[in-house]
Amino acid sequence: MKAQKMLLTVKEHKGEKVLYRKEYSVENLVVGENKQTFHIHLPAAKLWSTDSPHLYDLSVSVGTDNYTQRFGFRWFEVKDIHGDKQFFLNGKRIVLRTAISWSFWPDNGITPSDELARRQVESAKKLGLNMLNFHRTIGHSNVLDYADELGLLYFEEPGGNQYPISHFNDN
């Protein structure tokens, strides 16, 4: 199969500023899933944080196929500081102020409307929280989208406490 052109673009989510735009030649594309790796440098990109939730759109176009994904540049890690485990967001220590979200939604009991999802995130921010926990539930995409937009971290509790830890070990 001959090479095709792929256009890769990174731009501000709610702006017009384009941080990166380049056309690549991709070969051996087949029907179904294809994986390609590209390393790009974006020195003008701003990090996402709970105080400044900068978001970007990554767009990929090959022929008539287009895909766009919103994202933020961030990394979360746990560091050992003199025997004390501490959380870091983008290399800076963060103290997590959180509460449980039971995800009981009055409209239907299963999934939140966009209005309720946004209200939950806004309420958490007004209370001074920087994180919520999805408790005994899987996070809904509209809740996570608003959390990204408004600067709120989410933790999804893994559940499964009915099984002993040995059930998950490879040994």
Language model feature labels by segment:
Residues 138-140, 160-163:
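Solvent-exposed loop/turn segments at secondary-structure junctions
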Residues 1-146, 150-154:
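Secreted/periplasmic carbohydrate-active enzymes, especially glycoside hydrolases
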